[in-house]
């Protein structure tokens, strides 16, 4: 039997209210949250581990942990923040456990985005072959440099740049003050800027 569509949960309900239904054992409410956040979680995990199969598995594990931890959820906590805390902890553990296994060639520009199915890095037909090659090189370098950041900086950049989360949301997920979050992102972006400028100057 298919789970509930998004329209079956009244829009007036917040995610926190839906999660309270999950807390009481309402499986249809849990299915609703999975449907709503699955693409987002797969996209986040893909950007953290750069492996499509691992991203799917990690996203599934996030939701398993959400269900197993449902009794500990407090409605005072924003569901999105609680969800990303679970996801970031899982991503950090996965990165630690697989740091010697990650091949360099996992980043591919022609792979569809794990969240949207789009290929945003691919240039349009108006670009010359040389421009396309330069764009591919630049995007590969940016992704490579993001991947090389310290884990907390990388996580903050991914949430800020790709998940479109603001400073307050990132701060809540990472249990930092907003000023500390801004400093963390500033250092990360400054490192990326310096590395990319150095790369350009060598060419």
Please report, for each region that a protein language model flagged, where it lies by residue.
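Arg/Lys-rich amphipathic alpha helix in sigma70-family domain 2
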Residues: 71-75, 85-107, 135, 198
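Short helix-capping/turn signature of helix-turn-helix
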Residues: 36-39, 47-50, 139, 158-165
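Helix-turn-helix DNA-binding module
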Residues: 140-180
């Amino acid at each position: 039997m298919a789970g509930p569509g998004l329209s079956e949960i009244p829009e007036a309900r917040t995610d926190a209210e839906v999660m309270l239904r999950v807390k009481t054992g309402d499986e249809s409410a849990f299915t609703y949250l999975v449907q709503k956040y699955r693409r987002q979680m797969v996209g986040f995990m893909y950007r953290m581990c750069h492996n499509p199969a691992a991203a799917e598995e990690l996203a599934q594990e996030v939701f398993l942990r959400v269900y197993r931890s449902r009794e500990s959820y407090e409605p005072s906590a924003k569901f999105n923040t609680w969800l990303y805390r679970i996801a970031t902890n899982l991503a950090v553990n996965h990165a630690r456990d697989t740091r010697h296994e990650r091949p360099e060639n996992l980043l591919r520009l022609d792979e569809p985005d794990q969240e949207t199915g789009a290929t945003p890095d691919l240039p349009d037909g108006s670009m010359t072959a040389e421009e396309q090659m330069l764009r591919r090189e630049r995007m590969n370098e940016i992704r490579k440099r993001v991947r090389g950041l310290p884990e907390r900086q990388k996580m903050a950049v991914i949430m800020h740049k790709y998940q479109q989360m603001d400073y307050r949301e990132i701060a809540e997920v990472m249990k930092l003050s907003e000023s500390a979050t801004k400093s963390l992102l500033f250092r990360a972006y400054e490192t990326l800027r310096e590395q990319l400028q150095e790369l350009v100057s060598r060419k």
